[in-house]
Every structure is written in structure tokens, then in C-alpha cells.
Amino acid sequence: MTHVDQINVDQINIDGFEFGVQSSPGPKGAVVTTVFVIVHGIGTSHRYSKPLYGAIAANCSTYTVDLPGFGGTRTPKHRLRVEDYAKLLGDLLDTLGVTSCVVIGHSMGAQLATELAVQRPQLVSHVVLIGPVADAHRRTAVAQAVDLYRDTLKEPFSANLLVFGDYARCGLRWYTKTLRAMLAYAIDERIRCVVAPVLILRGRNDPIARRGWCSILAHNSPQGRLLEIAGHRHLVHYSAAVLVADRILEFAGVPRGAAE
């Protein structure tokens, strides 16, 4: 992972829901004020985004969050919809003093990023959806499980270790409740309401966020475009972190090494 001089770690409560937050102010002497926010997928945590976080934080102010019920945060008493998570995330960013950001969501996190951009268009300048779910033609628990299994077989062992460790920490009950929320969210319809530029990024060999599905999202987005990374899968932000960071920074108009 790219070295980051300073990482701040906080636990923040928003309306009784606990978030974990890691943040870096970016490099000393940075002349770019763009803020990036990374949102993880179902069952996981900030841990599998560390390589991407490091690559972006070496250039800009960056936050990565653990959503309520994930990454060791307190499990909510009731299921949260994607819309609820997005509302809480927006309130969290208000608390952190973030007034404009590039929001990056992976997998289910892409749903939250989309919904945040719909709910708070003035807060979100750019949207990056990495391996977005759930394919409208495969929006069942069984289909998602099959695709996840196929993906896992060829992901890096270190990535699988992180992901399944987080699954265990999350627990089956909360995972299942959140899965229902994930499958109920029609990202292909909600993305039509996003006014910010949208970058849809997938590993070319991703069996979860397939090319046809991602092409639909890019088409439905008023300012959407699709980018594929050859040789990578659903965890492309982990296995090709530096390349993915480069593409995201380029999309947001931020030069690498933007420091004096």
C-alpha cells in the first residue's frame, strides 16, 4: 500500500448509529482540495479498501468508512434500507465538515454512493461505482451467491482472507438482513436521477458486475461512462489499486502528486 503520513481513526455516532471512520488530510503542501470518500460493500469493511485508500490519500484528503453493523461497529437493532444508509452517510459527512466530495462505492457501496448523489446532489461532485450490484437479471440471493462463489475462486488469497474475516465479524443475521435491502434497491433506475458525472469501473473478468449490466448503468446515467480493467475481477480496487486510483483521480480532474 502507498505510504500515508497520517491516518486518523474515529468512531462517530449519527442518530444512534455507529460509524467507523479513517481519514487522511492528504500530502503536505497539497494544492488540490478535492475530498474522496470510499464506501465498502455488503459484509465487508474499510480493510479491503486500504490499498486504494493509500493510493488516493497520497494525493488528496480521503475518508473511508465502516457502515453501521460492519467492520466491528455496533449492529443496528433493525434493518436499514439503502436509502437509510445514504441518509446517515450524508449526515456523517456533514458532521465531518465535508461540503463536496467524490464518492467511491464498491459493490453494495455503489448503491449507497448512487443514492447519496440522488439525495444530496450538492454534496457529491463525482460518483465512482466499482463492481456495482445488483444485476437486474440476477437480483436473487441464489444468483448472487453463485456469482460470489465464482468470483472468489480466482481472487487473491489475501483479499479473500480479508473479506471472509469481515463476513464472520458481521455475522449471518445482519448480512442476511442487509442482503434483502441490497436486492430491493434498483440502482439501474435510481442512477437516472444522478446529475453528477458517473464512472462505472469493473474488472473485465468480474462475474458479479458483468459487462452487459454495467453498460446499462452507464447508459442510464445522464453523465455515465464505463471503464474496464483487464485481468481483474470483482475486487479490482484491491488487486489493481494503484491503477484504479489513477483512473479515479483522472476522472475527478486531480493530477497525481498534486503537492507543492
Q: Which residues does each PLM region occupy?
A:
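Catalytic histidine-centered segment of alpha/beta-hydrolase-like enzymes
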Residues: H232-A245
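Acidic catalytic loop of the alpha/beta-hydrolase fold
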Residues: R204-A209, H234
